């Protein structure tokens, strides 16, 4: 069974067991943001026996101590605050065998100006520690997203964005965007090392697993559904009519990880920016029923003339969540970490603008996901890791 499709159909993935003979590593990955929604998928896929470019040795960088739900991944965990240049140098510069950097993290601040400053500093700290100290460094893989074409969250509906479907050759918007800053920093830094290549990956709404992600839509909806179930309430739809009735798409976290790996090892994908999405479309009116069925809760409909927000419905629910965690023996979590209400409101409160996967296909990436199956599989994973009942 190829690694390429293992995530798509839920096949058992072959891992290198601790007592297996340790292979000579062909590639050494540095995943920056390893406990995030894409970092977690990369940490699962890179160590697989048949992952392209392998066998892979993997370093995973995150700010917090390693969580219990992440301990199964056979990686070298590096606790490091990349916003601190001294900590970045101390922790990352000794990793001299790194060949590939997968940068899949970000910091969320209150304004886009602050986002630009914070995220630029973090990215520079990593590259300043890695590029001069890793003689075999080959590739930097940077993840941004569809806001490249739409502008930052604070500008939604206030600025003129591109007409979808979005293609990678569209010009930058004339507005501040930390994605643009990160791309510029990367292009500047790769010039310092001959032969160093790069890729940029622009997913849409990500479906995946991580209790530590700041934009985990599936996890947020699972927590909302679990609270509705606990309180005996209907799962009301907290979004707009355009999201309920219109076409949406998503980007599966494992698919995005495969996309990163493909671009890192395939010569035809070097020095390019790519969209990455599942390749199909869905309507939230259908997925809402799926969500309700998975949690055994009554399914609501779009409510005309009612402005429903997750942030309002879930206000003050911390004691309820603590009770749910206690009664069901769940992994201890804080509601503010697993229920990202503002993000759910942004996604469900706006029309989804689609992208095009043609460039990825033309360069040789043919991966895809069935979004309904992916939605269910990520719900199942949240349950399996005891994040939700």
Swiss-Prot record:
Q: Characterize activity with respect to temperature.
A: Optimum temperature is 40 degrees Celsius.
Keywords, alphabetical: NADP, Nucleotide-binding, Oxidoreductase
Q: Which domain of life is it from?
A: Eukaryota
Query: What EC number(s) does this enzyme carry?
Result: 1.3.1.3
Q: Which residues bind NADP(+)?
A: 35-37, 63-64, 81-82, 105, 143, 179, 206, 213-215
The pH response of activity is noted as:
Optimum pH is 7.8.
**What InterPro entries does the database record attribute to this sequence?**
NAD(P)-bd_dom_sf, PRISE-like_Rossmann-fold
Instruction: Name the CDD domains on file.
Output: 5beta-POR_like_SDR_a (cd08948)
GO MF terms on file? Delta4-3-oxosteroid 5beta-reductase activity; nucleotide binding
The active site is formed by 147, 179
Reaction catalysis annotation: 5beta-cholestan-3-one + NADP(+) = cholest-4-en-3-one + NADPH + H(+); 4,5beta-dihydrocortisone + NADP(+) = cortisone + NADPH + H(+)
What is the enzyme's class at the highest EC level? oxidoreductase
- UniProt keyword annotation of Electron transport present: no
Q: According to its UniProt entry, what is the function of this protein?
A: Involved in cardenolide biosynthesis. Catalyzes the stereospecific conversion of progesterone to 5-beta-pregnane-3,20-dione. Can use progesterone, testosterone, 4-androstene-3,17-dione, cortisol and cortisone as substrates, but not pregnenolone, 21-OH-pregnenolone or isoprogesterone. NADPH could not be replaced by NADH.
Q: How does it assemble?
A: Homodimer.
As for family, the record states: Belongs to the short-chain dehydrogenases/reductases (SDR) family. Highly divergent.
Protein name, entry field: 3-oxo-Delta(4,5)-steroid 5-beta-reductase
